[in-house]
Design a protein with these regions (language model features):
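Amphipathic alpha-helical transducer elements in NTP-driven molecular machines
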Residues: 46-49, 65, 81, 85-92, ...
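Glycine-rich, phosphate-binding/catalytic loops in enzymes
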Residues: 85-86, 111-114, 214-216
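Conserved Switch II/interswitch segment of TRAFAC-class P-loop GTPases
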Residues: 42-43, 71-78, 89-151, 165-177, ...
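C-terminal-of-GTPase-core extension/linker across diverse P-loop GTPases
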Residues: 1-7, 11-17, 21, 139-345, ...
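Short, charged beta->alpha transition segments
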Residues: 84, 123, 183-186
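Conserved G1/Walker A P-loop phosphate-binding module
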Residues: 1-103, 140
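A generic fold-level signal
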Residues: 34-36, 61-63, 113, 191-192, ...
């Protein structure tokens, strides 16, 4: 799982990266925008995993992880030409960092206007996809003149359908593709189809109103989900002890940190759920897509388990907490046996039986 942080220059991308990952990368008002990208793998907080680990204190606790990449700034109007396009397409989700603070000491190429920047970026992402469609169609048409190809004709038909949808103002997501058509274009990794979070770096004075992000910035309809944070305030909080940090948050009217809110929102954006395993040496959380089968969950752990799948022993973590241990739950007959088509539920504790 990977989220890419990107946006126009001087918005606070690296500040946000530090807040989310605990890194200490240098931030500067005069970054030339040509530094290397940075990547950190972050544990996803989960109270349920903490409780499970509490039942098995001798075992190591291993949370699910989310990779976060900090990309350098992209100039206005240059997304379609950016060298970062490949990295954006590889990401599972996108975090567009938007400037919402005024500070003359940190130069910004345009007047600070979050609503305008969000609209502009969403249009640029759509344009980058449209350019990819046009480029591929041109090549396909040339190739099909040389030699007929059923697969090529099929791809051409789907891309023409996408182009028509974009030209009609419905965008790629409004093309109403069939599952087989979706599969045909999956390799394009269109940016307009990726989960998108707009994170606005707000002025300190706006801290008490961050929960009403859309109202605060008069955003109107957006494809991505808007959220806001106070980068300067939270950067100061990082330097404080836990007790002092809570008091500082309260002083600015902040109920939760951006890290807490992001790690709550990110799995939902990616349509993920979590299940848990209790092994000989570890208690571990795993992420899978919602509606994943037991067989797919087995594959998330190891292909050998998927290949040799026999049965899954399943109990919800909430039920398990009531029994106090997995063995106690088994003794009471509360652990179910499920087959490979069982749909994994968020919070399931699963033991996979498999042949080697």
């Amino acid at each position: 799982m990977n989220f890419a942080l990107f946006g126009y220059p001087k918005t606070g991308k690296t500040t946000l990266f530090n807040l989310l990952t605990g890194a200490h990368l240098e931030t500067t008002a005069y970054d030339d925008g040509h530094r290397e990208s940075s990547l950190r793998s972050c544990p996803i907080p989960d109270d349920r995993l903490d409780r499970l680990a509490g039942l098995y204190q001798e075992k190591k606790k291993i949370p699910a992880a989310l990779d976060i990449t900090d990309l350098h700034g992209i100039s206005y109007g240059e997304v379609k030409n950016s060298a970062l396009l490949g990295l954006l397409r590889k990401a599972d989700g996108l975090v567009h960092v938007v400037r919402g603070f005024a500070d003359e000491s940190i130069p910004h190429p345009r007047p600070v206007n979050p609503a305008q920047d969000i609209r502009a970026m969403e249009e640029e992402l759509a344009l980058a996809d449209f350019v990819s469609i046009e480029t591929r169609l041109e090549k396909l048409e040339k190739d099909l003149k040389k030699a007929k190809s059923p697969e090529g004709e099929k791809e051409k038909g789907v891309l023409e359908k996408l182009r028509a949808s974009v030209e009609a103002g419905r965008g790629i997501c409004g093309a109403d593709l069939a599952p087989a058509e979706e599969k045909t274009i999956r390799s394009f990794a269109f940016l307009s189809q990726k989960p998108l979070l707009h994170l606005i770096n707000a002025d300190d004075k706006d801290a008490p109103r961050l929960e009403d992000t859309a109202g605060l910035y008069c955003l109107g309809p957006t494809r991505g989900r808007p959220m806001a944070f106070c980068g300067r305030v939270e950067s100061e909080i990082l330097q404080l002890e836990a007790g002092e940090a809570e008091a500082f948050l309260a002083e600015f009217g902040l109920a939760r940190t951006v890290r807490q809110r992001f790690f709550e929102a990110a799995p939902r954006l990616l349509d993920l759920i979590f299940f848990f395993t209790i092994g000989k040496e570890e208690v571990r959380a795993w992420a899978v897509k919602k509606n994943a089968s037991a067989l797919a969950a087995a594959g998330a752990i190891h292909t050998d388990i998927e290949r040799g799948f026999i049965r899954a022993e399943v109990i919800s973590c909430q039920e398990l907490f009531g029994f106090g241990s997995l063995q106690a739950a088994k003794d009471k007959g509360a652990v179910r046996l499920e087959g490979k088509d069982y749909i994994v539920q968020d919070g399931d504790v699963i033991y996979f039986r498999f042949s080697t």
